[in-house]
Each structure stands twice: as structure tokens, then as C-alpha cells.
């Protein structure tokens, strides 16, 4: 593997991990509980001005669910990244 390819891989892994942490971080407001049932809130993506943008909730759910769940397809211990919510959090759209 060339050095350039390796640095690109490291960058992609870093970005992936950063997004994973953002999506699973309780302060992002992604997961909330309503009478014990998991529900989603909109995730804010900072834009550098004002309060940032709120993408459509459905796409936010799909994106964050994929980011959080994908590692678990290869390694079951990776499911630990989901800190809050119930198993239903992979199903809501």
C-alpha cells in the first residue's frame, strides 16, 4: 500500500469515528426517551454561522443509524457505541 493510500484510509477512519461519536453523543440530542420508548430528535450539523442546519429527520435517522450500526455487522461488540435508547432505535424512520 502506498503512503498516500494509507493516509487517505486513516483520514476516512478518523472522519467515520468522529461522526460515530457525534451521533452517539447524548449531548447531540439524537436519542431521547418518551415513556421508555426510543425516539429521535433532529441532529444539528454546525455550519459556522448561527445555530447550524437541521437536515430532514428521516434522512438524519437513516444516516446516524447506519453510522452507528454498520460496525456491528462485522463485530458484535461494536454495538456498545449506542449509549441510549432501545433496540427499536434501528427501526424508526
UniProtKB/Swiss-Prot annotation:
Highest taxon above the source species: Eukaryota
Name this protein carries in UniProt: Uncharacterized protein YJL197C-A
Organism: Saccharomyces cerevisiae (strain ATCC 204508 / S288c)
